[in-house]
Design a protein with these regions (language model features):
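Soluble FAD-dependent oxygen oxidases
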Residues: 1-528
Length: 528
């Protein structure tokens, strides 16, 4: 009987995508490093493996990168413990092949699972252990766990603890924290990375390091600097935050015909300065008019969470934001986990078990961009934006208010620098459902034009952007002799003055630039 290891080796060697013996050499190395040849056969998927396509697709969250022409990995490695991660790093480095690190697969540009050179995907989705310690008010969370799984495990142990992460439950913890994730408690508690207590990372030499052994600089860098530039984060230890027994949510829609412009103008002054327990996200979308057949208008939708009861919220908004006209019938009181579900699916009948569903192999075609607003946009400016949005057709905007805790934390505390001085962040958003080059080109052109139109209203020198809303239009690192100069272009936008420190950390811990992607942190130029 042929051993499983040899069967897989034969499979890989016969792969049409195999480049020489690189993939076979990798498998031999992995078997040797783990000393578990039978186990290795269950971890590695060659292109000839019947399950290869389903494993690849499971965590592709942008359908733009799920096409026949999208570059495919030579192999997919799906480790189940940290020693297998070590082995994958060592073996990929030994044979000189690029390693892509994927947790939830939500990178907007597919950077975690595509490349223009031969590559291997290190799929972290099986590393999903979550250990919650309510006495310590902390949790160790593996990088392949999802936010939904994390929230569920916290809720299992306590109804008065939570974590200030994002509102999309299928997002992977590794990428979310690695890029400085945020959620609807950021005005009260700041970013996810403001609550990281420790971490375990595999470095470029295949060593496992924790906070003490990695040192202050690397620990700083992996909390929002794009952790995949520095190593493979296996797990983060996070601090939980207190949440009240009652949380209040609401969703209110207004159209231009209902004084939406006045409401948006006032929102800019209120949302970043009001009680830090209140987070009011605003969606701005071009839609068909309800009153004028065949015409387009703008609809705004305010989606909010208040860490308190309904009476407190209505009293607060009637005083600070009467233009909104919030009424008792607009609000819902829930516990914290109920608010998580409401934000995720807007369904009052869903149980928390839904958070454990990863919904694999589901993806829209999407394009995203980001900006920061530091001065309120005038009413004339808003009307200019509405006009352009209606002309373009489909691209929407999402306004996320800052202030509160975000203004109290120094810009240098973590690599994420966008703190005091920012009123709100803009996410540009366009989704579509059908494949095709012309559709992709059309919507890409739309979102780029809208981004250009907003230039006068957003931050300057640099025009800042958010790493976790990845956008290759703002710069790409081609990993050649100009790597540092190319990195400065997007690095200044994502990290502002923190970019230089990130480069120094990168040069110290990964001088050979093994961990790299289209927007990774470069090393310092080598002296002649």
């Amino acid at each position: 009987m042929i051993p499983l290891f040899l069967l897989l080796l034969l499979q890989i060697s016969a792969s049409p995508a195999a480049s020489g013996s690189v993939d076979a050499t990798f498998l031999q190395c992995l078997s040797k490093q783990t000393n578990q040849p039978a186990q290795v056969s269950k971890l590695v998927y060659a292109q000839s493996n019947p399950s290869y396509s389903s494993v690849l697709r499971a965590y592709i969250r942008n359908a733009r990168f799920n096409t026949s022409s999208t570059p495919k990995p030579v192999l997919i490695v799906t480790p189940t413990d940290e020693t297998q991660v070590q082995a994958a790093v060592i073996c990929a480095k030994n044979i000189g092949i690029q390693l892509k690190i994927r947790s939830g697969g939500h990178d907007y540009e597919g950077v975690s699972y595509i490349s223009d050179v031969p590559f291997i995907i290190l799929d972290m989705s099986n590393l999903r252990t979550i250990n919650v310690n309510i006495q310590e008010q902390s949790a160790w969370v593996s990088a392949g766990a999802t936010l939904g799984e994390l929230y569920y495990r916290i809720w299992e142990k306590s109804k008065v603890h939570g974590f200030p992460g994002g509102v999309c439950p299928t997002v992977g913890v590794g990428g979310h924290l690695g890029g400085g994730g945020y959620g609807n408690m950021l005005r009260k508690h700041g970013l996810t990375v403001d609550h990281v207590l420790d971490a375990k990372i595999v470095d470029a030499n295949g060593k496992i390091l924790d906070k003490n052994s990695m040192g202050e600089d690397l620990f700083w860098a992996i909390r929002g600097g794009g952790a995949a530039s520095f190593g493979v984060v296996i797990a983060y230890k996070i601090a939980l935050v207190p949440v009240p027994e009652k949380v209040t949510v609401f969703r209110v829609e207004k159209y231009l015909e209902e004084n939406a412009t006045d409401i948006v103008y006032k929102w800019q002054h209120v949302a970043p300065t009001i009680d830090e327990n209140l987070f009011m996200r605003m969606l701005v979308q071009p839609v068909s008019s309800k009153t004028k057949k065949g015409e387009k208008t703008i609809r705004i939708t305010i989606i909010a969470q208040f860490l308190g009861n309904a009476d407190e919220l209505i009293t607060l908004l009637n005083k600070e934001f009467p233009e909104l006209g919030l009424k008792n019938g607009d609000v819902l009181e829930k516990d914290w986990i109920g608010s998580v579900l409401w934000w995720g699916i807007k369904d009052n009948n869903t149980t928390p078990n839904w958070l454990l569903d990863r919904h694999p192999d589901t993806a829209d075609f999407t394009r995203r961009k980001s900006d920061y607003v530091q001065q309120p946009i005038s009413k004339d400016g808003l009307e200019f934006i509405w006009k352009r949005m209606i002309e373009l057709g489909k691209t929407g905007l999402v306004f996320n208010p800052y202030g509160g805790k975000m203004s109290q934390i120094p810009a240098s505390a973590t690599p994420f620098p966008h703190r005091a001085g920012n009123l709100f962040k803009i996410q540009y958003s366009v989704n579509w459902e059908e494949p095709g080059y012309e559709l992709d080109k059309n919507y890409t052109t739309q979102i780029r034009k809208l981004h250009d139109y907003l230039t006068p209203f957003v931050s300057k020198n640099p025009r800042s952007a958010y790493l976790n809303y990845r956008d290759l239009d703002i710069g790409v690192n081609h990993q050649g002799k100009n790597s540092y100069a190319e990195g400065q272009v997007f690095g200044a936008k994502y990290f502002n003055a923190n970019f230089d420190r990130l480069v120094k950390v990168k040069t110290a811990v990964d001088p050979d630039n093994f961990f790299r992607n289209q927007q990774s942190i470069p090393t310092l130029p080598k002296k002649a």
